[in-house]
A protein has these predicted regions:
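FNR-like FAD-binding dehydrogenase module
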Residues: 1-243
Length: 243
């Protein structure tokens, strides 16, 4: 999918500052402000997001990022289960734990970014000759995956597979990193983000980015969101103001 311009990944980035909260143990924080800052007639949807870090001990510096864990859209999960004729209560195994397929698709697995490994595994599970042929042509596969989410592939090539086969074909969801748009010296126990919502129409269907759609469309002010600070040691302002 088309990535948000302010979702970032830094080489050499490390976990945040002195706090019990990190990528493996994120803070369940309050989303305090979700404000659209683009005009009514703008083709872009950009949000000013404020999240409370009160009592967490989390701190950040210029150049750091906020990692955001998100839930996939329940409507997207429902449609995927309908297309694959899988009951939402079907138990599946994921990383040694048991979930219902609905839980796994909502909380654990990547649905809004497509990738070659999914096509390969889905083609094998559904015995789809056309997809198997596509997998062999890397350039054609890259072109096919452009702007397609997982559900687009399944919609294009419907087939029967088990709930466990679907889970095994999907990769683990990764938190999205957003550049922090605030100075902690000014906002203290808050963190501010400027989030460009990934939203586009393709193949006859509306599409939303996973994390940006979650923050903009599915979280209300006062709702909880799991976050952590990702420190960027490659970007630091000089300690001396005269530098």
């Amino acid at each position: 999918t088309s990535p948000s311009a302010n979702v970032i990944a830094w080489p050499g980035a490390t976990d945040g500052h002195h706090s019990v909260y990190n990528k493996q143990n994120p803070l369940l924080a309050d989303l305090s402000v979700n404000q659209k800052i683009t005009g009514r007639n703008s083709s872009k949807d950009v949000r000013h997001i404020e999240i409370s870090l009160a009592g967490s001990g989390l701190s950040y510096q210029p150049g750091d990022a906020l990692g955001v864990y998100f839930l996939n859209d329940s409507a997207l999960v429902r449609d995927l289960l309908l297309l694959t004729a899988i009951s939402r209560d079907t138990p599946v195994q994921l990383a040694g734990e048991t979930f219902t397929i609905e839980q796994a698709l909502t909380e654990q697995l990547e649905l809004t970014q497509s990738y070659p490994a999914f096509v390969e595994k889905y083609a094998a599970a559904t015995h789809n000759a056309a997809l198997t042929e596509l997998v062999a042509d890397k350039a054609a596969l890259r072109a096919y995956l452009s702007e397609r989410q997982i559900i687009d592939i399944v919609r294009d090539h419907p087939g029967l597979l088990s709930a466990q086969q679907l889970v095994d074909a999907l990769r683990k969801q990764q938190p999205r990193l957003y550049s922090i748009a605030s100075s902690q010296a000014e906002v203290e126990d808050e963190v501010h983000l400027t989030v460009a919502v990934v939203r586009y129409d393709a193949y006859g269907q509306p599409h939303l980015g996973g994390a940006s759609g979650f923050l903009a469309e599915r979280l209300n002010e006062g709702d909880k969101v799991k976050v952590f600070v990702e420190q960027n040691n490659n970007f630091r302002l000089p300690a001396n103001d005269d530098t």
